Amino acid sequence: STVNQLFNGMKTSDSALIKKSFHKNAVLQTITRTAEVKNESINDFALSISKAEKESLDERIIFSNILIDGNLASVWTPYEFYYKGQFSHCGVNSFQLVKSNNEWKIQYIIDTRRKDNCKN
């Protein structure tokens, strides 16, 4: 799936695979602990991930809810993030995907990040 492709790109530090997962006008945001919403460009995100040591970034996701209507999909994935095998943080990713040219692409991601109330 497109979502798995994104996380495979992160794990292998492959910026091209990461970028391929996104629609050309995609939006990437995170909600901080203080409820501030931060934006990041897909290019900046892919560049920062490409600088990581391969296999050092491991975001373990669970597909807990997937809704599809025509060319729109909403995907909810709780996750735990590990850096070089050590637990870093957890949270939830909320994806909006669009089907374009018969291919699903990520249009929007917003996530939460926390160190407490994690299952690890």
Q: Language-model segments: which ranges?
A:
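Short beta-strand edge/turn micro-motifs at domain boundaries
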Residues: 90-117
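Short, aromatic-enriched amphipathic alpha-helices that serve as compact interaction elements
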Residues: 1-13, 21
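Short, well-ordered alpha-helical segments enriched in acidic and aromatic residues
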Residues: 13-29
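A mature extracytoplasmic/lumenal domain signature
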Residues: 22-24, 32, 77-81, 93, ...
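A short gly/proline-enriched turn/hairpin at secondary-structure junctions
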Residues: 27-37
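Hydrophobic pocket/interface hotspot
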Residues: 6, 18, 26, 75, ...
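Surface-exposed, charged secondary-structure patches
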Residues: 32, 40-86
